[in-house]
Design a protein with these regions (language model features):
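Alpha-helical support elements that line or immediately flank enzyme active sites
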Residues: 29-53
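Short, well-structured active-site flanking segments
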Residues: 48-64
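Short, conserved catalytic-motif segment at the N-terminal edge
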Residues: 13-25
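Predominantly the structural core of cysteine protease catalytic domains
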Residues: 16-17, 36-45, 65-185
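Hydrophobic aliphatic residue packing
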Residues: 23-26, 49, 163, 173
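A short glycine/serine-rich beta->alpha loop
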Residues: 22-32, 89-93
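N-terminal zymogen propeptides
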Residues: 1-16
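A short, polar/charged loop/turn motif at coil->beta-strand junctions and beta-hairpin connectors
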Residues: 9-13, 60, 169
């Protein structure tokens, strides 16, 4: 748990990551339910710029690659999981939604972090399935992930300060929430 007094004392009154040169270009997820993949790849891109000196204007990781392998297993060189399947078919992965847990688990297995040029995200039509061997074709690998669970009763100011502190400490956060369709319209 983050100490609120400490968090408030280390958070500047104003911060703009664009001025620091950390933010890559804004991307459009189109009509697909891949916001979770965009959030995670964006956080990876910011980390790459901030921590390993990547250039914000030139880094572009594939949201499609992460989303695809979030629902489809890649090739397992040890042959422990090559016959594993998900209940979601390959053509459902962009419409099914997801969350940070799904994405981080895939990234911990070195799936994702691939180059956008190799696996472009298409907003006009559902793209073809990827080869299983493409799962580990990564440009960047996840080293660490930090998770903070906010309970419903979490004080709003505390939650805001925790997120601000994490942005200052790690450069970016990826955020997931559940939106039930019955609350739309």
């Amino acid at each position: 748990l983050v100490n609120n007094r400490r968090a408030r004392s280390t958070i500047p009154t104003k911060y703009d990551a664009r001025q620091e040169g950390y933010l890559p270009a804004v991307r459009d997820q189109g009509r697909w339910g891949a916001c979770w993949s965009f959030s995670l790849t964006g956080a990876l891109e910011v980390s790459a710029v901030r921590d390993i000196g990547a250039v914000a204007d030139s880094i572009d990781l594939s949201e499609r690659h992460l989303a695809y392998f979030g629902y489809n297993t890649g090739y397992d060189a040890l042959d422990n999981a090559n016959k594993d399947t998900m209940t979601s078919p390959a053509d459902y992965y962009l419409t099914n939604g997801g969350n940070d847990i799904r994405g981080v688990v895939r990234l911990m297995n070195w799936n994702g972090g691939a180059d956008e040029d190799a696996y472009p995200y298409v907003t006009s039509s559902l793209p073809d399935a990827l080869e299983r061997t493409a799962a580990q074709n990564a440009k960047l690998y996840l080293e660490n992930a930090y998770r903070y669970n906010f309970a419903e009763e979490t004080d709003k100011d505390e939650a805001v300060n925790v997120v601000k502190k994490m942005i200052m400490d790690y450069g970016a956060v990826s955020w997931s929430y559940y939106n039930d369709a019955k609350y739309v319209n």
